[in-house]
């Protein structure tokens, strides 16, 4: 679990940075473009253990992180406000909070569009058809357009965990097995 998900202080940092970035993107008229670029960086982060270590480890200096982020963004074609933002974050030694910043930006942008954001945890990546079906199901329940933020966590074994606002629906196999284990302990 990334540091950004385990610390309340980090959440505040992530939200402040995301809010500042959103204001700049709104002024520049690039809210959607910045979200696409951040999502691209988030996908790189999900796929690369080395990048996760760079982001999470205090061992790397701000200069090392800045150079690495610059090179990664250039190679990935991440440009404009998003790359400048990531460089500032690296310079300020806040890369550990980038996953939270991306989630917070996505939530702020969705709220600006009149959508709500659902955080979805799945044991494996969802294909486009599954995402579309999930969005439709959530829209029928909430009555609003829903943007989904998918996190892959193989430890849930199967099923989904869906968080919309303060509500959570946990259909993960891990939770079902834990419930069964507790029930069996009570019986025997």
Curated annotation (Swiss-Prot):
Q: How does it sit in the membrane?
A: Peripheral membrane protein
Quote one Gene Ontology molecular function term: proton-transporting ATP synthase activity, rotational mechanism
For this UniProt entry, what's an example GO CC term?
proton-transporting ATP synthase complex
Q: Which UniProt keywords apply?
A: ATP synthesis, Cell inner membrane, Cell membrane, CF(1), Hydrogen ion transport, Ion transport, Membrane, Transport
InterPro entries, alphabetically? ATP_synth_OSCP/delta_N_sf, ATPase_OSCP/d_CS, ATPase_OSCP/dsu
PROSITE patterns listed in its UniProt record = ATPASE_DELTA (PS00389)
Compartments reported by the entry: Cell inner membrane
* Family recorded in the similarity comment: Belongs to the ATPase delta chain family.
Note the subunit structure.
F-type ATPases have 2 components, F(1) - the catalytic core - and F(0) - the membrane proton channel. F(1) has five subunits: alpha(3), beta(3), gamma(1), delta(1), epsilon(1). F(0) has three main subunits: a(1), b(2) and c(10-14). The alpha and beta chains form an alternating ring which encloses part of the gamma chain. F(1) is attached to F(0) by a central stalk formed by the gamma and epsilon chains, while a peripheral stalk is formed by the delta and b chains.
The UniProt function text for this chain reads:
F(1)F(0) ATP synthase produces ATP from ADP in the presence of a proton or sodium gradient. F-type ATPases consist of two structural domains, F(1) containing the extramembraneous catalytic core and F(0) containing the membrane proton channel, linked together by a central stalk and a peripheral stalk. During catalysis, ATP synthesis in the catalytic domain of F(1) is coupled via a rotary mechanism of the central stalk subunits to proton translocation.
Q: What is this protein called?
A: ATP synthase subunit delta
Give the source species. Answer: Agrobacterium fabrum (strain C58 / ATCC 33970)
Give the lineage.
Answer: Bacteria, Pseudomonadati, Pseudomonadota, Alphaproteobacteria, Hyphomicrobiales
